[in-house]
């Protein structure tokens, strides 16, 4: 049997392997791969089109052109297989060996591999400890390098010019050896004793103290140790033999007209061979040194450009002046091997067409055009035709199908029954972008799509196209049906909301049907059942919106759980409702009460309704319900016949007066500006403010008029009811349009923005109903075009962010049920400015509790640790008012190389605990990247109009309770008896009667407190007030003011107020001061006591110093007596520079890339007491003395705002200088939990602003990946180097091993890497190479002899295995288990088998042996 199979050379079962190893090939290895040396640059004979012998396409080396036929035609047919023809030397075998047989070129002079020379940091440079510049000069024959100094005073590796060399030769004769070119470098590499060097470096590392040296040594040590560990010899970085790619991989294709198209590689190889042959000839002829040298340099350059064209010097160009595509270009970049052919392949059995709406389909169906189906399912039809005996051969079957005989259509129906197909709409931004459907054959050429899945695909029917793919194997069909069928994917994986929500006309229909009208036809009637209502409606006795009373039968869950008892029992009750709602009650699934329908159904309500159905009635009932909702919606919208016309856009009559008043106010400001009372900036801000307020007012008047209408009720009185205006209904229901759009139609368009985001102060007072004049139209085109340009940029940027996110998380898969960790994070409701932005229930829903949840009133355990908190649980927790729950989080999961299900919690797309094998990393990346296109690109200029709205001047309680101050709150009582806040980060909390936090408010510096700690207050009570326009500088001590460095014209300037004539002193910017000396001084105040001594800070020797910052208006006079809490100076808020707040997509990218902000705030490194040291030029010195008495200094620029004061005690990680937080500092000083809270909250802020919901755990998953490397601080007895960054899991594994062996484990600190960095520093070199910087990644991996264990998804896709996620994870687990048991069973046999089979001799397979050694 085996012989028979061999005869036809069946596709062999590919090698099973668990890892891939990469390394440098030794010259002998390259020769062993080769099937012969390529000696001539010729390719094919242009007359006979046969390959030239010994040329680049030689049949003798690479194999026959035609299957089983030698070149001269002496041997043809299978029977001669394996014969080598004596005439032409060609082996008789398959032609496809030309894809795998390699050749080689023996180089006449060695050549350095450009990747190891020029890819930074230069590996050759590191091994030789020489600079790149020097090595290059040697390699390209510009200088000599000393190889063996002998007895001379020269040093090894010394560089000398030609002149030097000749002088030294005259001086020392042949006492020493110096060489040029790659030979010299090879000699140096051979001379290196790696073990010795490593020992030496390790001792030097221990003994040195300088940072720079440590860094340098560690780098070099890493490279040398890599060589040592991998057993690769450094001299292999210099090539003596050049391998030649198999000819089929660099084809030469005849075009019509006798021309040839060829791969660039052939050109590059040809140059190498030409130069190599010329060099050989020159060496034989003993040509002069200078000619040989030139030839050697040209050979080096030819090999360089073959390997990586354009890396050094100018790129080699072909006939048409474009750079040739070298081997490196073949693998890197978007069009390279990795991204083009391995990660994204075109697949067979697929087609695409335009989509149209299919309202008659069920949720799990799609309409497939007959012709498409016929083409896609061809093989199945052929098979069926043969089985049925209609056709005897495939050829006959083909004919039948082509003629489209009736029997073929019958068979097609049969074939596609229960055979799901996958539909995909590009761009596939999340996993719902591909779903499976059962095909329904339709006439026409467009694919029909169910309306409810449009939201998931983000599809509309304005010409969108979709692709169809057919899963072929039974396993694929099974997976498509169970995992991907549209009716099994009804929730968004990003947030757990339903994805099958109706939109547009469906919503409009349902909304119209569930509205109620006063005094509709038939109001007040009572009906015995829904069928009676329907009959009355059909006979036009009642209107849809009339209020009626109806007896409605609901199916409720049966309390009786005994055997045979029905699950649902009917319950009849009388409801006051409307006709439309009663009719809709027909489609309610059992288990839902009628009350969910008994209200106007807007889009949000419908979404909530479907969600409730899913939680209460399960998946099947929900899908059926959604389908019926859709059908009813369409039907009712048609019956309603809603249309819009110009008269529906009601312009409010008050508009004229409102706009007129505003114009008057603007005129008044212009007048003030002309008389110099206000600055240009203030005028602009005020004008913009006026117009935005006006726009609001007009909009409000318009909405009031539009949203209600007068109506006569049954008793004949006039009253107002919600309007049935078509435009209003569309916006109110959420079907189409929004209040803002209606305002533009019927109110006023308002202010427009310039492309740079600044606001044009002339508003557009017209609306679209009145029409715009030319100027107004021109102004509005400005912003509109910017919008379009933005969208294009946004899409690209968003796509790139998604790609980076996917890359960093692609190997994160749930691999076990529970890691057993007792760590977690404490979740609280998210409160901002006293508002609850996100309730606790939303934050803990679907998480696993890590500690018991206790009822605060009775102290009994509600939910044990390890419980998955579902809807009922979080509702109960909310009802009891528990304000903090400790839950598990992906960040603290202790699973290595993956995550555990308990730390992840609920799979949001399914609503149950996540399954083992779920690729949660990719899902997280998609959930964050998918809404990326909805985020804005723009950065917000805070200044002018925008900040005006944000200025608050007081804070008031929103609920009843008790005031509590945070520990950081400090205040003093001034002479008037007012409490003035002197802490920068004080907060006031409002707690309820059990002591649970209800609100939290920040109280700024200088605020006056109106309520003290422990005061009981009612909602609406003011807690504190402050002046929003200025920020005071307040003294905490009393005394007499003594100015220091306050010199008029030097550090301060006198300003006289135009209106009041009072003068104040203003501190001027150090940069604008005259002399050098005055730049470093800082105006400040000291206080003197009654005896004229300086007031000291209690308990210290320091005098009280209060510094004034730039722009401060000093309000006290020298020698003035001041009391505690008095204001010394004010800083106008206006003069604070308008700072740009990065918003939208760039902000998200900034957070995930972990970039340090420009003027980052400074955090205290230690816990201790603050004091100010001696100021240096332009900087002030802040000293923190820790509890042991050590001093830690910080230099702070003068213009920065210091948040602490002399003598204040600060905690480690507390902010001491104002500014945006630096995530690296947060991690270092406050730990992982604080960092995660920071990143999660910041990212969520951006998305929340756009109204996008994303679950926190997705962001946490990404933060986990950003923290996956650790830096070794002390290597203990491990194999790591101090300062090295390693994978956390590796480190833990190694430490476990050390502890098991009783050695000293390594200690480490956490490192935060940006997502790009993290993707590139992964342990898998295949994944990193396919992401970015392919050359660098591969160079590094080759030297280290890296081994890729194929843990992630990407690596496995690239090598073509099943991915280790989902069903693939189970497959690999089973395979490994089987291998383990087999290995034990067959240990004996294995030894003999290995002897039989040996290793496969196909050179292409060579690097792919199981690297399990």
From Swiss-Prot:
Database matches in InterPro entries: DNA-dir_RpoC_beta_prime, DNA-dir_RpoC_beta_prime_bact, RNA_pol_asu, RNA_pol_N, RNA_pol_Rpb1_1, RNA_pol_Rpb1_3, RNA_pol_Rpb1_3_sf, RNA_pol_Rpb1_4
Molecular function per GO: DNA binding; DNA-directed RNA polymerase activity; magnesium ion binding; zinc ion binding
Keywords: DNA-directed RNA polymerase, Magnesium, Metal-binding, Nucleotidyltransferase, Transcription, Transferase, Zinc
Residues binding Zn(2+) 1, per UniProt: 70, 72, 85, 88
The keyword Protein biosynthesis belongs to this UniProt entry's keyword annotation: no
Keyword Transferase part of the UniProt annotation: yes
EC number of this enzyme: 2.7.7.6
Record SUPFAM superfamilies: beta and beta-prime subunits of DNA dependent RNA-polymerase
GO biological process assignments: DNA-templated transcription
Record: residues binding Zn(2+) 2: 819, 893, 900, 903
Essential cofactor(s): Mg(2+); Zn(2+)
Reaction it catalyzes: RNA(n) + a ribonucleoside 5'-triphosphate = RNA(n+1) + diphosphate
Superkingdom assignment: Bacteria
A cellular component annotation (GO) from this entry: DNA-directed RNA polymerase complex
Family: Belongs to the RNA polymerase beta' chain family.
Function description: DNA-dependent RNA polymerase catalyzes the transcription of DNA into RNA using the four ribonucleoside triphosphates as substrates.
Quaternary structure and interacting proteins, as annotated: The RNAP catalytic core consists of 2 alpha, 1 beta, 1 beta' and 1 omega subunit. When a sigma factor is associated with the core the holoenzyme is formed, which can initiate transcription.
Family annotation (PANTHER family): DNA-DIRECTED RNA POLYMERASE (PTHR19376), DNA-DIRECTED RNA POLYMERASE SUBUNIT BETA (PTHR19376:SF54)
Protein name from the UniProt record: DNA-directed RNA polymerase subunit beta'
């Amino acid at each position: 049997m085996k012989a028979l199979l061999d005869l036809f050379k069946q596709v062999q079962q590919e090698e099973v392997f668990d890892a891939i190893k990469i390394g440098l090939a030794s010259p002998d290895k390259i020769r062993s791969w080769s099937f012969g040396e390529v000696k001539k640059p010729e390719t094919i004979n242009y007359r006979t089109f046969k390959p030239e012998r010994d040329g680049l396409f030689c049949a003798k080396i690479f194999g026959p052109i035609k299957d089983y036929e030698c070149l001269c035609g002496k041997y043809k047919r299978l029977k001669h297989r394996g014969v080598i023809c004596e005439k032409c030397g060609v082996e008789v075998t398959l032609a496809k060996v030309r894809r795998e047989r390699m050749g080689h070129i023996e180089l006449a002079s060695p050549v350095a591999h450009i990747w190891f020379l020029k890819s930074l940091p230069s590996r050759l440079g590191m091994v030789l400890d020489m600079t790149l510049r020097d090595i290059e000069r040697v390699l390209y024959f510009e200088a000599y390098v000393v190889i063996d100094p002998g007895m001379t005073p020269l040093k090894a590796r010394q560089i000398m010019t030609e002149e030097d060399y000749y002088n030294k030769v005259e001086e020392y004769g042949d006492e020493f050896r110096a060489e040029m070119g790659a030979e010299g470098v090879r000699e140096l590499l051979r001379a290196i004793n790696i073990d010795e060097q490593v020992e030496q470096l390790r001792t030097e590392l221990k003994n040195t103290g300088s940072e720079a040296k440590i860094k340098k040594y560690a780098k070099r040590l890493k490279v040398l140790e890599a060589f040592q560990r991998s057993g690769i010899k450094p001299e292999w970085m210099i090539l003596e033999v050049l391998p030649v790619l198999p000819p089929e991989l660099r084809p030469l294709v005849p075009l019509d007209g006798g021309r040839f198209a060829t791969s660039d590689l052939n050109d590059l190889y040809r140059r190498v061979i030409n130069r190599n042959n010329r060099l050989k000839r020159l060496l034989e002829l003993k040509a002069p040194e200078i000619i040989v040298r030139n030839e050697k340099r040209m050979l080096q350059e030819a090999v360089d450009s073959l390997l990586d064209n354009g890396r050094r010097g100018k790129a080699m160009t072909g006939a048409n002046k474009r750079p040739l595509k070298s081997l490196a270009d073949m693998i890197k970049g978007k069009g390279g091997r990795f991204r083009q052919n391995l990660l994204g392949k075109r697949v067979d059995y697929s087609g695409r067409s335009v989509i149209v709406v299919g309202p008659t389909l069920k949720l799990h169906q799609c309409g497939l055009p007959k012709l498409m189906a016929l083409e896609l399912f061809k093989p199945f039809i052929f098979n069926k035709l043969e089985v049925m005996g209609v056709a005897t051969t495939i050829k006959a079957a083909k004919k039948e199908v082509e003629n489209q005989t009736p029997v073929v259509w019958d068979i097609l129906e049969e074939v596609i029954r229960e055979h799901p197909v996958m539909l995909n709409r590009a761009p596939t931004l999340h996993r719902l972008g591909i779903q499976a459907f059962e095909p329904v054959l339709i006439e026409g050429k467009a694919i029909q799509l169910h309306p409810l899945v449009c939201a998931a695909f983000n599809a509309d029917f304005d010409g969108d196209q979709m692709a169809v793919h057919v899963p072929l194997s039974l396993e694929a069909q099974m997976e498509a049906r169970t995992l991907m069928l549209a009716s099994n994917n009804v929730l968004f994986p990003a947030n757990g909301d339903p994805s099958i929500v109706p939109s547009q006309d469906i919503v409009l229909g349902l909304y119209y049907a569930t509205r109620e009208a006063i005094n509709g036809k038939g109001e007040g009637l009572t009906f015995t059942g829904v069928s009676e209502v329907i009959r009355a409606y059909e006979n036009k006795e009642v209107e849809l919106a009339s209020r009626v009373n109806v007896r409605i039968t609901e199916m409720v869950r049966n309390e009786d759980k005994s055997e045979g008892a029905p699950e649902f029992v009917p319950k009849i009750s009388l409801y006051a409702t409307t006709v439309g709602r009663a009719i809709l009650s027909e489609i309610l699934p059992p288990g839902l009460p009628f009350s969910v329908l008994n209200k106007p159904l807007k889009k949000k309500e419908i979404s909530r309704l479907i969600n409730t159905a899913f939680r209460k009635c399960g998946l099947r009932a929900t899908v059926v319900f959604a389908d019926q909702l859709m059908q009813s919606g369409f039907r009712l919208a048609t019956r309603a016949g809603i249309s819009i016309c110009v008269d529906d856009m009601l312009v409010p009559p008050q508009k004229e007066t409102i706009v007129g008043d505003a114009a008057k106010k603007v005129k008044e400001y212009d007048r003030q500006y002309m008389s110099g009372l206000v600055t240009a900036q203030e005028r602009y801000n005020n004008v913009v403010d006026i117009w935005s307020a006006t726009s609001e007012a007009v909009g409000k008047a318009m909405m009031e008029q539009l949203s209600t209408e007068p109506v006569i009720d049954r008793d004949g009185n006039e009253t107002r009811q919600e309007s049935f205006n078509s435009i209003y209904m569309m916006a109110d229901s959420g079907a189409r349009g929004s209040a803002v759009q209606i305002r533009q139609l019927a109110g006023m368009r308002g202010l427009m923005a310039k492309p740079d985001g600044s606001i044009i102060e002339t508003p557009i007072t017209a609306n679209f109903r009145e029409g715009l004049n030319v100027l107004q139209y021109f102004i509005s085109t400005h912003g509109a075009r910017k919008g379009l340009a933005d969208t294009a940029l946004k899409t690209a940027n968003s796509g790139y962010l998604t790609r980076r996110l996917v890359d960093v998380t692609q190997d994160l898969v749930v691999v076990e049920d529970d890691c057993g960790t007792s760590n977690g994070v404490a979740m609280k409701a998210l409160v901002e400015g006293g508002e609850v932005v996100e309730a606790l229930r939303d934050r803990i829903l679907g998480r696993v509790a890590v500690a018991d949840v206790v009822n605060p009133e009775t102290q009994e355990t509600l939910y044990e640790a390890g419980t998955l908190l579902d809807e009922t649980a979080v509702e109960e927790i909310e009802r009891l008012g528990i304000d903090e729950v400790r839950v598990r989080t992906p960040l603290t999961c202790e699973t290595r190389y993956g995550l555990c299900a308990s730390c992840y919690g609920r799979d949001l797309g399914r609503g149950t605990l996540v399954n083992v094998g779920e690729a949660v990393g990719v899902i997280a990346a998609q959930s964050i990247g998918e809404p990326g296109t909805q985020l804005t690109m723009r950065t917000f200029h805070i200044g002018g109009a925008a900040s005006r709205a944000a200025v608050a001047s007081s804070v008031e309680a929103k609920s009843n309770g008790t005031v509590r101050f945070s520990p950081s709150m400090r205040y003093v009582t001034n002479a008037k008896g007012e409490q003035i806040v002197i802490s920068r980060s004080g907060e006031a909390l409002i707690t309820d009667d059990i002591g649970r936090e209800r609100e939290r408010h920040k109280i700024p510096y200088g605020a006056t407190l109106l309520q003290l700690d422990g005061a009981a207050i009612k909602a609406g009570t003011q807690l504190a007030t402050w002046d929003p326009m200025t920020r005071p500088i307040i003294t905490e001590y009393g005394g007499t003011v003594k100015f220091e460095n306050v010199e008029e014209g030097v550090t301060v300037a006198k300003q006289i107020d135009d209106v009041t004539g009072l003068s104040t002193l203003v501190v001027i910017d150090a940069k604008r001061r005259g002399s050098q000396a005055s730049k470093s001084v800082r105006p400040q105040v000291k206080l003197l006591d009654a005896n004229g001594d300086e007031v000291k800070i209690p308990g210290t020797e320091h005098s009280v110093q209060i510094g004034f910052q730039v722009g401060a208006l000093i309000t006290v006079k020298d020698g003035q007596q001041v009391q505690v809490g008095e204001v010394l100076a004010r800083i106008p808020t206006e003069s604070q520079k308008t700072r740009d707040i990065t918003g939208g997509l760039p902000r998200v990218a900034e957070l995930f890339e972990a970039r340090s902000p420009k003027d980052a705030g400074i955090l205290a490194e230690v816990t201790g007491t603050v004091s100010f040291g001696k100021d240096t030029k332009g900087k002030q010195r802040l000293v923190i003395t820790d509890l042991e008495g050590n001093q830690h200094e910080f230099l702070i620029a003068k213009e920065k705002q210091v948040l602490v004061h002399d003598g204040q005690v600060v905690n480690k990680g507390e902010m001491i200088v104002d500014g945006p937080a630096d995530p690296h500092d947060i991690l270092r000083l406050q730990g992982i939990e604080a960092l995660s809270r920071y990143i999660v909250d910041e990212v969520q802020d951006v998305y929340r602003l756009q109204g996008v919901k994303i679950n926190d755990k997705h962001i946490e998953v990404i933060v986990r990946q950003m923290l996956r490397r650790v830096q070794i601080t002390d290597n203990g007895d491990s194999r790591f180097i101090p300062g090295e960054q390693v994978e956390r899991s590796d480190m833990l594994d190694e430490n476990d091993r050390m502890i098991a062996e009783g050695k000293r484990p390594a200690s480490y600190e956490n490192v935060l890497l940006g997502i790009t960095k993290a993707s590139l520093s992964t342990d898998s070199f295949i994944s990193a190479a396919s992401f970015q910087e392919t050359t660098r990644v591969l160079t590094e991996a080759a030297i280290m002899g890296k081994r890729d264990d194929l843990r992630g998804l990407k690596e496995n896709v690239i090598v073509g295995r099943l991915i280790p996620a989902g069903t693939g994870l189970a497959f690999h687990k089973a395979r490994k288990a089987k291998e383990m048991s087999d290995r034990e069973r067959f240990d004996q046999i294995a030894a003999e088998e290995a002897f039989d089979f040996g290793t496969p001799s196909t050179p292409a397979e060579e690097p792919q042996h199981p690297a399990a050694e």
